[in-house]
Structure formats: C-alpha cells, structure tokens
Amino acid sequence: MKINKKISKIIIYFFLYLIFSAHSPWGQYLAYREQHLLIMSTREDAPTYPYSKILVDVINKQLPEASARAARARTFRRVQGLFSTNQMPLLLLSKKNAKALIKGKGVFKKFGAADAKIIYYFDDLVLLAQPSFPDKFAWLLTNAIVKGEKELLGATSPLNIKKITDIHPGTLMALNNEKMPELIKK
C-alpha cells in the first residue's frame, strides 16, 4: 500500500515536471525579435498603433531586409518595462508621452524614466530608439524613412525641429549625408 502511494506520487511529480518543463515559446520569441525590426506602440496612446503599421509598411518597401513589424503593448507600464530593459529597440509615442518617458513624469511617473534617442517625427508622434541601437541600423532606418517620406503623413526630420539634442548618432549621419557606419559588435 505504501509502495503504491510512493509510486503514484513519483508518477504525479514526473508528469508535473513534464508539463512545466515542456518547450516554452520564450526561445522562439527571442529569435523572432532578432529576425524582425519591432516598432512598439501602446493601446493607451491611441494614434501610435495605426501609424506604426503605416510606418512598418514604408520601411518594408524601402528596406525589406529589416522585416519590420508593429508591436503593441497594452499599458504604459509595459512600454516602459520593455523599452528600459532594451527588449524593444524602437518605440513610437506621442510627443507628450515621449517627453514623459524620457523624464519619468506624467503617465510614466510611477515607472521611472528611460533613456531614448530620437529617430524621426511624424506630426505629433516621435520614433524613439534605445541609446544602444546600432548607428548602422539607425542610419538604415532613417534612410528608409527619408526615401518613403511622401507616404508618411507629417514626417519631419529632427534637424527641422528646434531644441532637439538627443538625436540618434546614426540618424544624424544619415540626415547629414554621411556614409553608412560599420556595425560595431559589442
């Protein structure tokens, strides 16, 4: 009787182990992030997701190897978490919310500030990049946006906006017609 109980416990633990150690999709998600240029937006900043889909279409026309995709976070908390931990390299927000993210104020007050560099403006929206986003990728992305500007309503170079100091170095190189930088592996 005791042996049967022990055997049944072992079997139950074994099945629980199998269930919880099954192949998780986490590895696939990391691979997906490496294969695609993800541009994050959020439901809580209403105009960002529809515009991110337009932006992705233009980028994929101009730079198909980027394999750009729109990604949408549910909340500002999730946006800050993914962006500040370098899990999402690009983020499209309204100007007001972009400033709040960088300063850790407004809707991001509870979650803290996050470093960001500016890639491009689209009317009231701003495309931000991680400071660690490679200069070469920022150059390629900026070049694709410039080439597709006619399809991007309100696209405005950061060079045309006064008082902008945090432009991504790769973006500056592209806008100043400098040659594409080499990819530096860290």
Language model feature labels by segment:
Residues 11-21:
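Bacterial N-terminal signal peptides
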Residues 33-48, 68-71:
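Short, well-ordered beta-strand elements
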Residues 41, 119-137:
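A bilobed periplasmic-binding-protein/Venus flytrap-type ligand-binding module shared by bacterial periplasmic
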Residues 48-64:
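Short, polar/charged alpha-helical segment
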Residues 64-81, 162:
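Short helix-initiation/N-cap motifs at beta->coil->alpha
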Residues 88-110:
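A ligand-binding cleft/hinge motif common to bilobed small-molecule-binding domains
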Residues 105-121:
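Short beta-strand->loop
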Residues 151-186:
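An extracytoplasmic/periplasmic, membrane-proximal ligand-sensing/linker region
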